[in-house]
Amino acid sequence: MNTEKDRLLTFQMWPLTFLSPADLAKAGFYYIGPGDRVACFACGGKLSNWEPKDDAMTEHLRHFPNCPFLGNQLQDSSRYTVSNLSMQTYAARFKTFCNWPSSIPVHPEQLASAGFYYMGHSDDVKCFCCDGGLRCWESGDDPWVEHAKWFPRCEYLIRIKGQEFISRVQASYPHLLEQLLSTSDNPEDENAEPPNDLSLIRKNRMALFQHLTCVLPILDSLLIARVISEQEHDVIKQKTQTSLQARELIDIILVKGNYAATIFKNSLQEIDPMLYKHLFVQQDIKYIPTENVSDLSMEEQLRRLQEERTCKVCMDKEVSIVFIPCGHLVVCKDCAPSLRKCPICRGTIKGTVRTFLS
């Protein structure tokens, strides 16, 4: 029974439809009966009374954590790149869940088995291998499915669950990456903001990128009002193109909040009365798409998202975290954990994807 193929052959009389023989065989089990009783070829552990939400690998880990087969499968990181070596074992990951909120409907055993460890606040978890982060867990969520849904290239996931499982999950969400790369500035699941200055700037963010040309005087006004620091001022001023300065300016205003929006509004009224009128009075400023972004490769779309490399929170380190599901890439890995909502669109952050593009 040392091979997965041999174990799979024992399931010809397997009685359950909700748990596949392939998953059980991959987790080290072969069928012995009666009923739904299976045994591990390596540790001899026996399990039965399976339920619809059970995952074979998770249950194997939970009941027989010292199984040598699991040790070989889960702890040998020599074949794939690991983001956090200290969390490469199931035991290490499981220990991080000692203060896991009891109100969260997903169990630590499931999360640790799927490669996640607890970050210590709210319900934030991160994969030890791909560094993908998830939060906002709901009843019925399967950690393996969510792992495959958002981080299909994770090498740990591929090794443990197999490409067939990942492809099946991805096929259930055919437009997921397009959604992630659409970078919507108006998340549908958020309560509408009152129509104030900040919300108008947020709503017309992309249009302002195109139409705003008087960046430096507004930047100086923000510095004089002590809304931004000299470092933040200089980072934006040093951009070589006005369009790049405009992007940075608008995004830092969205991060700083209402007072920054008020300074922007007052400065714009003096410096560019026509743009002020279209944005704040008539509210008819238009964004003109210059090209069909969907025609670009996924990698090129990410490269363009990463064009502005400075984190909009610390204005120091490079951006490296894409928020799920809004797709905005505006913060570094150190600033991301403290944020619950995207500073650009105010959408709830349900997960993070780390980018490594040069």
From Swiss-Prot:
Q: Which SMART domains match?
A: BIR, CARD, RING
ZnF (RING-type) intervals = 311-346
GO biological process per UniProt: apoptotic process; negative regulation of apoptotic process; negative regulation of necroptotic process; positive regulation of protein ubiquitination; regulation of cell cycle
What keyword terms does UniProt attach to this protein? Apoptosis, Metal-binding, Repeat, Zinc, Zinc-finger
* Ranges where the CARD domain occurs: 193-283
Q: Name one Pfam family in it.
A: BIR
BIR repeats: which residues? 4-70, 90-157
Q: Which residues form the signal peptide?
A: none
Q: Where are the transmembrane segments?
A: none
Presence of the UniProt keyword Metal-binding in the record: yes
Q: Name one GO molecular function term.
A: ubiquitin protein ligase activity
The answer to keyword Repeat applying to this record is: yes
Q: Name one GO cellular component term.
A: cytoplasm
- Which SUPFAM superfamilies would you find in this protein's record? DEATH domain, Inhibitor of apoptosis (IAP) repeat
The record's similarity note reads: Belongs to the IAP family.
**This protein's name:** Putative inhibitor of apoptosis
Write down the species.
Answer: Sus scrofa (Pig)
